């Protein structure tokens, strides 16, 4: 693992505050994008499963700290969702457009379902009414992943240019 943890922690703190304090005032189709999940997924797409899982852990942790969800539930859901999709990514050809879209949809579904199951198990919710938000959450996250992924990709190429050999 690289020193990216020093970038992950402050970035996830900011994203956690934005997700819980700012974005709820501007819902799109009744929901908001999960920015921390999408940034962790984009980072994992660029740097691999290990980095993605670490970023997902901190994304979930700070999302929980700044919301009313018990600490650790979103973290577990994000780690499971991102690790699962990054593991399956290895079986498909590389694409900088289609793969982020497909993996964002799949990560949203997995993390959403794991989150619902954990909330049911701990008695935080008592019905599955929130599952009705899943289709719009998928749509919003799929629309938001490309700008996030490409921004991180461009920053990565500027900060760490690839060595050219002749």
Please place each PLM-identified region on the residue numbering.
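Terminal, non-globular segments
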Residues: 1-166
């Amino acid at each position: 693992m690289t020193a990216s943890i020093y970038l992950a922690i402050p970035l996830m703190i900011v994203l956690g505050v934005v997700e819980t304090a700012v974005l709820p005032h501007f819902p799109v189709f009744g929901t908001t994008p999960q920015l921390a999940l999408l940034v962790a997924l984009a980072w994992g797409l660029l740097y691999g499963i290990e980095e993605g899982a670490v970023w997902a852990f901190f994304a979930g942790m700070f999302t929980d700290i700044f919301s009313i969800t018990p600490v650790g539930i979103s973290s577990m859901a994000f780690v499971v969702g991102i690790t699962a999709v990054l593991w399956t990514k290895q079986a498909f050809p590389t694409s900088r457009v289609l793969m982020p879209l497909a993996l964002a949809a799949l990560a949203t579904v997995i993390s959403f379902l794991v989150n619902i199951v954990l909330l049911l198990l701990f008695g935080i919710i008592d019905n599955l009414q929130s599952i009705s938000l899943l289709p719009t959450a998928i749509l919003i996250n799929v629309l938001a992943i490309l700008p996030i992924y490409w921004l991180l990709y461009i920053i990565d190429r500027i900060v760490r240019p690839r060595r050219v050999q002749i």
